[in-house]
């Protein structure tokens, strides 16, 4: 997913990072595992974005939609019960995370949280402070503005499916 990249000591949104490498590369650092050719790296991402604690969050929603995502997704700290910050999926950060980690297959979880939405938004690029647009992950995301693509919701109970072939077209798109 894209959360661990934002918190990675080397690739995260410093100073809002952890002291470790919670990425595919961090596996080798922590246990001495030597990757070989043909290694499959599974990336896991939510269908929306959430964040614990401080730090830049371009797609954060401060309205009722953000609260709805938080409630439906049970986005509360397990120990403290603290509300997590929620927003639309940030494809700029997700693409960056996929690239840095060498992800070979992406698994999308919690898509059922968005089942009831007529439309959803996906951040496909950023507007930088100077007005230019980029779909590359910039060094500093503190003041970027998300550029969204609005998509039709799938309006289907995603928990009923057992294979990718069953997914509705609106979800696959």
What residue spans do the PLM features occupy?
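Short beta-strand-to-turn element immediately C-terminal to the catalytic PLP-Schiff-base lysine
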Residues: 7-8, 30
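Short Gly/charged-rich anion-binding patches and loops
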Residues: 22-23, 92-93, 173
């Amino acid at each position: 997913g894209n959360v661990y990249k934002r918190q990675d000591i080397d690739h995260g949104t410093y100073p809002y990072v952890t002291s470790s490498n919670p990425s595919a590369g961090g596996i080798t650092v922590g246990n001495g595992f030597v990757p070989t050719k043909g290694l499959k790296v599974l990336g896991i991402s939510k269908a929306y974005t959430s964040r614990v604690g401080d730090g830049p969050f371009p797609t954060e929603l401060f309205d009722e939609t953000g609260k709805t995502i938080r409630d439906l997704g049970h986005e509360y700290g397990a120990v403290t019960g603290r509300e997590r910050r929620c927003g639309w999926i940030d494809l700029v950060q997700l693409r960056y995370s996929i690239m840095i980690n060498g992800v070979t297959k992406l698994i999308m979880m919690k898509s059922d949280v968005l089942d009831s939405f007529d439309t959803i938004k996906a951040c496909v690029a950023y507007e930088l402070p100077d007005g230019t647009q980029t779909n590359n992950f910039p060094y500093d995301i503190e003041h970027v503005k998300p550029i969204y693509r609005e998509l039709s919701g799938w309006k289907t109970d995603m928990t009923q499916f057992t294979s990718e072939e069953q997914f509705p077209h609106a979800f696959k798109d």
